[in-house]
């Protein structure tokens, strides 16, 4: 467990996964083991969304890739590369064509192994400041590699009626619950605020959109995404790809209200 701290905040990171962000004694992150989701955060890469209706195949310029929901990056392990009192860096490296074991097999998937026809290096860094937690993503790889990126943090809810503020509109928890597994789309948006017992704002650079998901009342996932996957058929998911130009950088800033 990597622990970052300053005078009023503590961050807990377990093998690259953000499992705690406590400010003045208030925990903002969903606790693993609580109802709702078995994780606390994950990255969705190089695809976002499910592909079971597409035979677990995604079109790329180098042919079809075998993928599963939210991509194969989440099935790989992070290596810790740097750590200080207030910062930490983690890396995943992938070599084209390498088989990655799929934890969804055999219960939820027919695919035992996932592959991708491109090399890449994926870096996730955390920086705890006096007013926020910055999470940066840096993707390095082959020129022209297609990809999507989503960040999937889960926030702990402390009250019965939290409100999500986005693009000047209020979104109630019941609205997120009603959408179910598809996730509620918030398009053309770079900042979302969750108003609960305390409030926290999720500011982003590079993503451009969000989606919100939960199936319980004690947590909600507010996810910055480069593409909303449910806008297209699963067989057309490649329409949402960006193309890598050597390096791509994305930023998420979690800013607790004062």
Question: What are the residue ranges of the model-derived segments?
Answer:
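Surface-exposed acidic/polar loop and edge beta-strand patches at domain peripheries
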Residues: 1-132, 145, 156, 160-258
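Short, hydrophobic/aromatic alpha-helical segments in well-folded domains
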Residues: 121-122, 136, 150
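Asparagine-centered strand-capping/turn motif at beta-strand->loop junctions
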Residues: 137-143
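Surface-exposed beta-strand/loop patches in extracellular or lumenal glycoproteins
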Residues: 149-155
């Amino acid at each position: 467990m990597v622990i970052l701290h300053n005078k009023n905040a503590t961050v807990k990171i377990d093998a690259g996964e953000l499992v705690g962000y406590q400010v003045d004694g208030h925990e903002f992150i969903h606790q693993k083991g609580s109802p709702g989701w078995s994780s606390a955060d994950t990255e969705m890469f190089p695809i976002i969304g499910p592909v079971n209706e597409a035979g677990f195949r995604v079109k790329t310029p180098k042919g079809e890739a075998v993928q599963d929901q939210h991509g194969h990056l989440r099935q790989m392990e992070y290596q810790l590369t740097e750590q200080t009192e207030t910062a930490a860096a983690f890396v995943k490296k992938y070599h084209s064509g390498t088989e990655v074991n799929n934890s969804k097999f055999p219960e939820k998937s027919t695919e035992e192994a996932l592959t991708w026809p491109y090399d890449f290096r994926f870096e996730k860094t955390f920086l705890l400041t006096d007013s926020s937690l910055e999470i940066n993503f840096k993707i390095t790889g082959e020129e022209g590699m297609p990809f999507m990126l989503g960040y999937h943090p889960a926030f702990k809810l402390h009250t019965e009626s939290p409100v999500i503020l986005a693009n000047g509109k209020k979104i109630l928890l019941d609205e997120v619950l009603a959408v179910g597994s598809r996730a509620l789309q918030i398009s053309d948006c770079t900042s979302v605020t969750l108003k609960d017992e305390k409030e926290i704002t999720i500011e982003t650079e590079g993503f451009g959109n969000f989606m919100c998901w939960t199936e319980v009342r004690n947590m909600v996932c507010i996810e910055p995404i480069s593409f909303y996957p449910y806008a297209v058929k699963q067989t057309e998911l490649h329409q949402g790809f960006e193309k890598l130009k050597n390096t791509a950088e994305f930023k998420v800033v979690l800013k607790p209200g004062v």
